[in-house]
């Protein structure tokens, strides 16, 4: 399960430039660096609209269609193996794919020790996702993150990992026919990410500051005061 992400780059315009994406001034004013993004938070996704990439804020949690009177909980992750054949996601996978814009994500080992998975060069980590338009009472679309089987790095502590879309294939992910996009639902190459142990401060969703990425030793030092 992918349930926490980061986006710590200072400037949203810099991010939009990296992605060659359109960004409205109104949306740009809402940006702030995030060190512990959790489900139900508003975050940033890349979609394809009006013949170009667009960077927009969206809420984390995709609400599946359900019979009248039977509300379903928002889904933060969907297994990538399901989207091509499952009736609940086939249409979304065909026409509403997105990339969730991050520079890393967290996973925990059995001792609840957190690790931050990120690129060695500090670059963007684009997670394959699906989105749905804003409901009548909401101002933002919603998204979910697709998962796949883990690569060797992540399999040491978890049996799933998010789908990571290579920057060079982002247009294929956003616009290609479903069969072509499905080929990108696969474990990331081993050299894509590194794992950095970080502070248990990130274990609490209320904590969202640079101290979340401090080394574990900072926890022990903090306990002395």
What does each model-found stretch correspond to?
Residues 1-225:
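Short linear sequence motif anchored by a di-proline
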